[in-house]
Amino acid sequence: MMEIREGYMPFMGYQTYYRMVGTQTGNKKPLILLHGGPGSTHNYFEVLDRLAEEDGRQLVMYDQIGCGESYVEDRPDLWNAEVWIRELEELRSHLGLSQAHLLGQSWGGMLLLEYLCNHEPEGIKSIILSSTLPASWMWGQEQMRMVRYLPQEMQDAIEKATASGDYSDPAYVEAEAEYMRRHAAETPKEDAPDCLRRPVRKGLEAYITGWGPNEFTPLGTLKDYDVTGQLRDIKAPALIVSGGDDLCTPYIAKYMYDRIPESRWELFRTCRHMCFVEENEQYIKLLKDWLNANDE
């Protein structure tokens, strides 16, 4: 039976929850998984657990401070890249992850790129940029472009809310939900994996303070995030993954692919924002091949 070890790391007077799946075998470096949000949790990454068993590779996932088992509230001073990067650095040290692969999904990819480009960490064997972005402005622009494919009344509701800053109108709530259903994910059905259905403490405060009120409007502490000028300096091999109907549009994914020197781009044509859920088997095979090719 696959070993799963859970624990907590003391961090800034709070506790960061982590979950380690499997054990390291041979020369296979562990894979650290950085979840999205900000304010989401590690839960959805549990659909990748069998990678540990099939590949003999340890997976390390954790709930970033502010959500899930690392829930903290009323601390807006914590919801910024500096704190989340410090948490990642301390977790690597705490768990002895001196050499590892990094996978960041959505906001987790922003965290990964900020860490790689501005903190020059050692021991990173490769990176996987899954449905992510190199700049907040680019994400916002692409979302607003895709909003134009919604019915006109939904476009109007989003435009009105964006202009007024009032996101409570039911028409806006319906429009935003439809947009996310088309490009992020829908509510998990009864036959979905348990990790996608079980109750979770999402860090809404972390999301709103860190990012903004919705995907179209980056107004938070991450609004000036932009590593576009540093992509050419990335030395680690990079696998870019995105979906054809993703919030991470093909334009965003190709922008990164064109600029990161040693990169490969895999487009899951029919997927939305969570390719690893929607095409789980194909995604795990892709990861296996990529990680084994980049362990040295």
Write out the residue ranges for each language-model feature.
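Alpha/beta-hydrolase
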Residues: 148, 159-236, 255
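Conserved loop-alpha-helix segment in the C-terminal half of the alpha/beta-hydrolase fold
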Residues: 221-271
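Active-site loop/oxyanion-hole signature of alpha/beta-hydrolase fold enzymes
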Residues: 61-107, 111
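Conserved hydrolase catalytic core segment
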Residues: 98-142
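N-terminal cap/lid segment of alpha/beta-hydrolase-fold proteins
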Residues: 1-15
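Flexible "cap/lid" loop of the alpha/beta hydrolase fold
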Residues: 125-166
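Conserved HGGG/HGGXW glycine-rich cap/lid loop of the alpha/beta-hydrolase fold
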Residues: 14-73
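Catalytic active-site module of serine/aspartate enzymes centered on a nucleophile-bearing elbow/loop
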Residues: 263-296
